[in-house]
């Protein structure tokens, strides 16, 4: 079963590892789609690493079978090319699960969307890391 996880993955942290590990448990092949610099920037993200560096880092994680950079213009172009059985979304990804499933059906895909639970640890996002660094250096 092919699982597709998506994200920016700029500053890798335990929340990312939780998301990808839980995604991998759902199937035998995990492909991770990395948001392009342009796509991430259009959502207000200020990136530390460029898309190729982010793809490389994610590709080195044990649970990841493949990491690719997504398409800028149409996210469903990547979905159609990958043809996943399941698309996993993180707790903080603002997509409508049923709309994604409907769009997949329109493309002739029988893809399910699964939300992955929030990581319980203290640092669970890149924003948490940025805040922590600022706190440490402003003491």
UniProtKB/Swiss-Prot annotation:
Cofactor(s) recorded in Swiss-Prot or TrEMBL: a divalent metal cation
The UniProt annotation places ATP binding at 8-9, 13-16, 92, 119
Where on the tree of life does the source sit, at the highest rank? Answer: Archaea
Single GO MF annotation? FMN adenylyltransferase activity
What are the UniProt keywords, alphabetically?
ATP-binding, FAD, Flavoprotein, FMN, Nucleotide-binding, Nucleotidyltransferase, Transferase
Which pathway does the database say it acts in?
Answer: Cofactor biosynthesis; FAD biosynthesis; FAD from FMN: step 1/1
Pfam hit, one: CTP_transf_like
User: What's its EC?
Assistant: 2.7.7.2
One GO BP annotation is:
FMN metabolic process
What this protein catalyses is: FMN + ATP + H(+) = FAD + diphosphate
Looking up HAMAP family in the UniProt record yields:
FAD_synth_arch (MF_02115)
Q: Which family does it belong to?
A: Belongs to the archaeal FAD synthase family.
| Quaternary structure and partners | Homodimer.
> What this chain does, per the record?
Catalyzes the transfer of the AMP portion of ATP to flavin mononucleotide (FMN) to produce flavin adenine dinucleotide (FAD) coenzyme.
Q: Quote the protein name from its UniProt record.
A: FAD synthase
